[in-house]
Design a protein with these regions (language model features):
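Terminal signal-anchor or tail-anchor transmembrane helices
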Residues: 194-219
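Juxtamembrane amphipathic/hinge helix adjacent to a transmembrane helix
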Residues: 161-197
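PAPS-dependent sulfotransferase catalytic domain
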Residues: 85-150, 154
């Protein structure tokens, strides 16, 4: 959905943005809010964005509807089993890639946020039937909560027409982005940020070593 909205001119706030905005404090803000330690300034958090997508913001659609009275809600629906498979892969990726490097500040905060999201999604149990039931219950809740004039129930196979009609946007002259690149995108982003943050952590030590070497060579 993020790719489709981008082609329509919308800049979406995604989990990726929360991680990228670590130095602005986004991960800490989300953790504090999800752990009931502080309120969230939605207007400030999303000041540079036109839309929100993905976790953790998707949990708080009611709060965002209150903060943005003119906002519309797009509920993307898919086969529950396909969603479960995708979610399980994402959890495995996180456990493989992020858990071992949580000593890096950005990834320690991300690991905490991921566990907070996991708690809200799974409700304390990652049992297949339990989690799928919660997924279905969430979709039913959104349909029952959001006024019909503000809600689009959307499947990727529906293509551009219903989405563009709902948003009042022209239909792009290109295929709808059907591919699910979430896992690949997360993997690529994580690896890049790991390298960047490790360099930042190591730089003072490398600089100090360079000074020592220079001093020794000048003796």
């Amino acid at each position: 959905m993020k790719s489709a909205l981008a082609k329509l001119g919308y800049r979406s706030y995604h989990m990726e943005e929360a991680v990228m905005n670590f130095e602005k404090g986004d991960l800490d803000k989300w953790n504090a809010y999800m752990e009931c330690r502080s309120e969230m300034d939605w207007q400030k958090l999303f000041a540079d964005y036109d839309a929100t997508a993905d976790l953790p913001s998707a949990f708080y659609y009611r709060e965002q509807m209150a903060a943005f009275p003119d906002a519309k809600v797009i509920l993307t629906v898919r086969d529950p089993e396909a969603w479960w498979q995708s979610t399980a892969k994402l959890v495995n990726l996180h456990n493989t890639l992020v858990e071992p490097i949580k000593f890096i500040p950005r990834f320690g905060a991300f690991q905490r946020l991921f566990r907070n999201c996991e708690r809200v999604v799974a409700g304390g149990s990652f049992d297949h039937d339990h989690v799928v039931a919660r997924f279905n219950a969430h979709n039913a809740e959104v349909k029952a909560t959001v006024p019909p004039e503000r809600l689009l129930v959307f499947e990727v196979k529906d293509g551009w027409e219903p989405l563009c009609k709902f948003l009042g946007a022209p239909v792009p002259n290109e295929p709808f982005p059907h591919e699910n690149t979430g896992i690949a995108t997360v993997d690529k982003m994580m690896r890049l940020l790991v390298l960047t943050d490790l360099i930042k952590l190591a730089w003072p030590w490398l600089a100090g070593l360079a000074v020592v070497l220079i001093l020794l060579l000048n003796r």
